[in-house]
């Protein structure tokens, strides 16, 4: 036995490195001592990860972001600014209609301009009421749908900005070019000739009645270029279709029929020239498509030499509203009002998986 132990000791000394400075070897601490010192858990965790990667070599490690950023911040204060912008331009439109009304030439002196649609289609008196009723239905459907949208603040500011900009354009076109009435059936209110107080009353009457004929507030002439009714009918349909599920084809079809029938009824009633309707449709659809293309594409939000859309005068306003919105808005719905947290709390006791296993073990013993 002594000979065997001596041989093992000599073999151990031969296997050690020749460097005299490294002759001391630190003894390995037992596992219990490492756990006491708090050093056992990280080593066991790292060794477990290494074993897991060896066992599952096909797994791909994904780096998680350090900070989770909201891709669609609500920013209701921006929506409030867009709402004020829309209301201001709508009120400005009523003021401009009142001003332009004083410049409309009498129909006896300036007869209606020739219009091909009017040459082939006779006037139907009740058609304009149908157009306004369709517009009211579409606006009601859109407001109801908007209330149930999850990201209603972002969609709301888009709608307010677009409709405000369209009515700002309408103020400009009405003021620079005053067209005669489209038909001899028009009964325009008498001119006030500088009576400021009466003009204010007319403005308030237009605002309170929504500028609709069925409410008796559409008594002024001159707001022909371009058609505000066409703007409303077209824009509400575009927003309804854009922010509703794609498989709601029946819903889209009904809204499209309401919009198309309303626009046709404007012409059948001879309330607007055909050019008024064409320009209104063109400007509304282009502004809607341009805005949403820029909002959905990250590269179009940057002002550059190749991005010609960034040269629009409203691009700084657009960037202010959309700079924090990352990508296309998903079609998600939620309740308009959030219930208190305690309303739907269950009185039943909740168990974790660990607690359930422990109780099962107790029952088995």
From Swiss-Prot:
EC number(s) of the enzyme?
2.7.8.27
How is it regulated at the activity level? Inhibited by bacterial PC-phospholipase C inhibitor D609.
Gene Ontology molecular function terms on file = ceramide cholinephosphotransferase activity; ceramide phosphoethanolamine synthase activity; kinase activity; sphingomyelin synthase activity
> Which regions of this chain are Cytoplasmic-facing, per the record's topological domains?
296-365
Tell me the impact of changing residue 343 to A: Strongly decreases palmitoylation. Abolishes palmitoylation and dramatically reduces plasma membrane localization
Task: Describe the task this protein carries out.
Answer: Sphingomyelin synthase that primarily contributes to sphingomyelin synthesis and homeostasis at the plasma membrane. Catalyzes the reversible transfer of phosphocholine moiety in sphingomyelin biosynthesis: in the forward reaction transfers phosphocholine head group of phosphatidylcholine (PC) on to ceramide (CER) to form ceramide phosphocholine (sphingomyelin, SM) and diacylglycerol (DAG) as by-product, and in the reverse reaction transfers phosphocholine from SM to DAG to form PC and CER. The direction of the reaction appears to depend on the levels of CER and DAG in the plasma membrane.
InterPro entries with a match to the protein in the record: Sphingomyelin_synth-like, Sphingomyelin_synth-like_dom
Q: What's the source species for this entry?
A: Homo sapiens (Human)
Q: What else is known?
A: Overexpression of the human protein in mouse causes increased non-HDL-sphingomyelin and non-HDL cholesterol levels, decreased HDL-sphingomyelin and HDL-cholesterol levels and increases the atherogenic potential of non-HDL lipoprotein particles.
- What disease is mentioned for this protein? Calvarial doughnut lesions with bone fragility: A rare autosomal dominant bone disease characterized by low bone density, distinctive X-ray translucencies of the skull, multiple fractures, elevated serum alkaline phosphatase, and dental caries. Patients present with childhood onset of primary osteoporosis and typical sclerotic doughnut-shaped lesions in the cranial bones. Calvarial doughnut lesions with bone fragility and spondylometaphyseal dysplasia: A severe form of calvarial doughnut lesions with bone fragility, a rare autosomal dominant disease characterized by low bone density, distinctive X-ray translucencies of the skull, multiple fractures, elevated serum alkaline phosphatase, and dental caries. CDLSMD patients show neonatal onset of fractures, severe short stature, marked cranial sclerosis, and spondylometaphyseal dysplasia.
The protein's PTM annotation reads: Palmitoylated on Cys-331, Cys-332, Cys-343 and Cys-348; which plays an important role in plasma membrane localization.
Q: Where are its TM segments located? A: 80-100, 128-148, 159-179, 206-226, 248-268, 275-295
Q: What is this protein called?
A: Phosphatidylcholine:ceramide cholinephosphotransferase 2
Q: Which residues are modified by lipidation (S-palmitoyl cysteine)?
A: 331-332, 343, 348
Give the domain of life. Eukaryota
Tell me the compartments it is located in. Cell membrane; Golgi apparatus membrane
